[in-house]
Swiss-Prot record:
Protein name: tRNA pseudouridine synthase A 2
EC number: 5.4.99.12
Catalysed reaction, written as an equation: uridine(38/39/40) in tRNA = pseudouridine(38/39/40) in tRNA
Source superkingdom: Bacteria
Assembly description: Homodimer.
InterPro entries the UniProt entry points to: PsdUridine_synth_cat_dom_sf, PsdUridine_synth_TruA, PsdUridine_synth_TruA_a/b_dom, PsdUridine_synth_TruA_C, TruA/RsuA/RluB/E/F_N
Record bears the keyword Isomerase: yes
Gene responsible for this protein: truA2
Record: active site: 53
Any one GO biological process: tRNA pseudouridine synthesis
Keyword Isomerase assigned: yes
UniProt lineage: Bacteria, Bacillati, Bacillota, Bacilli, Bacillales
Organism: Bacillus anthracis
Family: Belongs to the tRNA pseudouridine synthase TruA family.
MF-aspect GO terms: RNA binding; tRNA pseudouridine(38-40) synthase activity
Amino acid sequence: MNNYKLTIQYDGARFKGWQRLGNNDNTIQGKIESVISEMVGKETEIIGCSRTDAGVHALNQVANFQSDEKLVEHKVKKYLNQYLPNDISITNVEEVHDRFHARYNSKAKTYLYKIWNEEHTNPFMRKYSMHVNKKLNVKSMKEAAKHLVGSHDFTAFSNAKSKKKSMVREVYSLEVMEEAGFVQIRVSGNGFLHNMVRKIVGALIEVGLGQLAAEAIPQILEAKQRNQINCLAEASGLYLENVEF
């Protein structure tokens, strides 16, 4: 069986997320599977590295699919980009080992979150960032971020859909940056629970607004109570930035 790795970019604003929900749904997975199935002449499933939610974007999503026939990578890329909607782009196609699995073989993921932090709205970024109109205390946010780096039980930063055997995840790095009206948050880790990144960003926003003390983060982690974080950052500001294998 021939196995092909896809690197994908998409604007998630109008989609219901990555994961296919039905035969004719408006999802990234569904759109790509439909075109690949047409190309190879049989129903074909793709496996994505990250099941991004509705409204979330990707700069480097990775997926794989298998085919009975040998395919030419550049022709696959050309075909997919010709027939996919223009808010989904295949940036690379690569034949890989038949055991390669986009979800199970990933070693690290990096997400970027964009906050538009000006009093006025930014009409050009409304689908691609979260607007916070009060000035954020970035210094306090950076202090809070330090408490989240490392291996922790992140139950408090998940939602009820997170039903993993272990809620322990390792955050390798968590950066808070200011740039031209934006506050950007970049987080890397070995894996993330459902809504974990958006909850982390939400907690940092609460700290930045003075609604939560940076020093309270360790106690929140220890308590493992989901109701401790009131802010779930909007999907629009979240980007899957990179995946490492």
